Swiss-Prot record:
It catalyses: UDP-N-acetyl-alpha-D-muramate + L-alanine + ATP = UDP-N-acetyl-alpha-D-muramoyl-L-alanine + ADP + phosphate + H(+). One of its GO terms (molecular function) is UDP-N-acetylmuramate-L-alanine ligase activity. GO terms for cellular component: cytoplasm. The gene is murC. This is UDP-N-acetylmuramate--L-alanine ligase. InterPro entries: Mur-like_cat_sf (IPR036565), Mur_ligase_C (IPR004101), Mur_ligase_C_dom_sf (IPR036615), Mur_ligase_cen (IPR013221), Mur_ligase_N (IPR000713), MurCDEF_pg_biosynth (IPR050061), UDP-N-AcMur_Ala_ligase_MurC (IPR005758). Pathway: Cell wall biogenesis; peptidoglycan biosynthesis. Coiled coil: none annotated. ATP binds at G112, T113, H114, G115, K116, T117, T118. It comes from the Bacteria. It comes from Neisseria meningitidis serogroup C (strain 053442).
Length: 468
């Protein structure tokens, strides 16, 4: 690609998946530019690297580009896309550019409905501890690196593989991981579980014959596809029939301690203890996937232990902001999380309970997309009803039109009928920080959760707290 392409322009460069690829390409020596409707931390970071980031979208931005890369949020009517096509400049999706990056390195692609970002981050952490200096592109900021992407000198690139639009089928990794499969983004698959399964099978089969997949057998849908997988694979999970499994799992504060057992073909059989520097049984599974990849590339047990214990977390994945001051003179622990599907929400809430069993659990939640709220309405009401106090803000539409009886007011009514909780409704997410300060009590843990504009709440809450 380097002999034919010099200038690469990203439309929607501020998106978490786009900004990481842009940064790696910039560090590889390409001339990178981009545009976005809104400034954010990602665009500021890219600008500090010397990348030209334009505010808004106009046709002139693509002048001189050899290729234009778009995110899934960018419509074909976008003026930059229209101008590029008129000038016969290739317009490609983000995943296709990620696939090109994998041609420079041996690719390790992490797929699954939940846990991709954490598993990718843990894998990068262990490979780094093993001295393998990987390149990584992650859907969240790796706290230890201060960025969501980095160009390493080693032979591996670790990246998330996105199933939401089936774009992971562009990738050709030498190793792949499937953390789980759940019924999400079903509009992409014609609301067919069979088509969803086939997409993951096709993703695994994108590997060469010498590749290897690591598949989580704790997921019912993953177990269902195993008979159809014809490429080499190993299983992992909490069951002792898996090739890599965990026992003796215990919470040690906000960490997880467990024993790893390896009975994988071609590897030394045995067991060893690890401490994972994050809470939750679901993160034990994510760690097992990273351990499997690490063993396959030759990392030592010591490197695995170091990478897991020294893991500093990733942005918006049970990200602890510490204690905030309350108007009543007490304090509450603020934690931020990206969870927006009932399955991952339940796992994160269980992690919070396990790490802080003595605290009252307060959840501030912003549903993401009306279609998801409608399709999983009953599952949402069940998981939301498990907390001690609940504040709901309106659905983040993500470009969708409102759907009757699939909004936060409807969720609040359904939860109220169950009789355990009295949900508090906050129509405008901008009012949420002040409302939370009035709801919280001394010693609480407040979990700020959702994939939309609620991500701005922690900073605003911290600022308000400082004024007390």
């Amino acid at each position: 690609m380097k002999n034919r392409v010099t200038n690469i322009h990203f439309v929607g460069i501020g998106g978490v998946g786009m900004s990481g690829i842009a940064e790696v390409l910039h560090n590889l020596g390409f001339k990178v530019s981009g545009s976005d409707q809104a400034r954010n931390a990602a665009t500021e970071h890219l600008g500090s690297l010397g990348i030209q980031v334009y505010p808004g979208h106009t046709a002139e931005h693509v002048n001189g580009a050899d290729v234009v890369v778009t995110s899934t949020a960018v419509k074909k009517e976008n003026p930059e896309v229209v101008a590029a096509l008129e000038q016969q400049i290739p317009v490609i999706p983000r995943a296709l550019m990620l696939a090109e990056l994998m041609r420079f390195r041996d690719g390790i692609a992490i797929a699954g409905t939940h846990g991709k970002t954490t598993t990718t981050s843990l894998t990068a952490s262990i490979l780094g501890a093993a001295g393998l200096d990987p390149t990584f592109v992650i859907g969240g900021k790796l706290n230890a690196a201060g960025t969501n992407a980095r160009l390493g000198k080693g032979e591996y690139i670790v990246a998330e593989a996105d199933e939401s639009d089936a774009s992971f089928l562009h990738l050709t990794p030498i190793m792949s991981v499937v953390t789980n499969i759940d019924e999400d983004h079903m509009d992409t698959y014609g609301h067919s579980v069979e088509k969803l399964h086939q997409a993951f099978i096709d993703f695994i089969h994108r590997m060469p014959f010498y590749g290897k997949a690591f598949l989580c057998i704790d997921s019912e849908h993953v177990r269902a596809i195993l008979p159809k997988v014809s490429k080499p694979y190993a299983t992992y999970g909490l069951d002792d029939t898996a090739d890599i499994y965990a026992t003796d799992i215990e919470n040690v504060g906000a960490q997880m301690k467990f024993t790893v057992h390896v009975q994988m073909k071609g590897h030394e059989q045995g067991s060893f203890e690890v401490v994972l520097n994050m809470p939750g049984r679901h993160n034990v599974l994510n760690a097992l996937a990273a351990i499997g990849v690490a063993l396959e590339v030759g990392a030592s047990v010591e490197a695995i232990q170091k990478g897991l214990l020294g893991f500093e977390g990733v942005g918006r994945r049970f990200q602890k902001y510490g204690d905030i001051k309350l108007p009543n003179g007490g304090t509450a622990l603020l934690v931020d999380d990206y969870g927006h599907h009932p399955v991952e929400m339940a796992a994160t809430l269980a992690a919070a309970r396990g790490a802080y069993p003595e605290k009252r659990l307060v959840l501030a939640f912003q549903p993401h997309r009306y279609t998801r709220t409608r399709d999983l309405f009953e599952d949402f009401t069940k998981v939301l009803n498990t907390v001690d106090a609940l504040v709901l803000t309106e659905v983040y539409a993500a470009g969708e039109e409102p759907i009757a009886a699939a909004d936060s007011r409807a969720l609040a009514r359904a939860i109220r009928v169950l009789g355990k909780l009295e949900p508090i409704y906050c129509e405008n997410v901008a009012d949420l920080p002040e409302m939370l300060l009035n709801v919280l009590q001394d010693g609480d843990i407040v979990l700020n959760m959702g994939a939309g504009s609620i991500n701005r709440v922690p900073a605003a809450l911290l600022e308000l707290s400082k004024q007390i």
